[in-house]
Amino acid sequence: MNPTVSIAVILTVLQAAHCQMIRDLSACLLGQSLRVDCRYENKTSNPLTYEFSLTRQQKHIIQSTISVSENVYRNRANVTMHKNLVCLYLHSFTTSDEGVYMCELKATNDYTGNQIKNITVIKDKLEKCVRLSLLIQNTSWLLLLLLSLPLLQAVDFVSL
């Protein structure tokens, strides 16, 4: 095999070998609901599968596309997916829902295995969610607004 072709194949495999990585896992209270944000870096367009679970004495699957969710959480939990963010919402959150929450992500055809991150959730120690946090994930609109303020002021469109 040609050495140039070999190097190209190795680089392709190495690039595809690590397709996503969980960057951050955070939790906050949104009214009476728990929100768990699982932020990840995705380097592929392959579909993403996820699993959110809670461990107290044993593991309880809350919401998943990897395995079957437990019945007790089906009516209380939902997941939303945004660019580089998977959010779990657990409604009617109480102290009995405290424990270690896990986010597990896997991109289809990613041979490095699942990416997993844990966070300990205690209701009294949770901060309230900032409602704009999802909008800030995509900051291009915010940057455009900030950059256009001087122009808007120059034409006396906005007076600050």
Swiss-Prot record:
Residue numbers of Pyrrolidone carboxylic acid PTMs: Q20
Residues in the signal sequence: 1-19
Residue stretch(es) of the prosequence: 130-160
Domain of life from the UniProt record: Eukaryota
Record keywords, A-Z: Cell membrane, Disulfide bond, Glycoprotein, GPI-anchor, Immunoglobulin domain, Lipoprotein, Membrane, Pyrrolidone carboxylic acid, Signal
All residue ranges annotated as the Ig-like V-type domain in the record: 20-120
Localization terms from the record: Cell membrane
Reported function: May play a role in cell-cell or cell-ligand interactions during synaptogenesis and other events in the brain.
PANTHER family: THY-1 MEMBRANE GLYCOPROTEIN
Protein name per UniProt: Thy-1 membrane glycoprotein
Organism of this sequence: Gallus gallus
Source lineage: Eukaryota, Metazoa, Chordata, Craniata, Vertebrata
Gene assigned in the entry: THY1
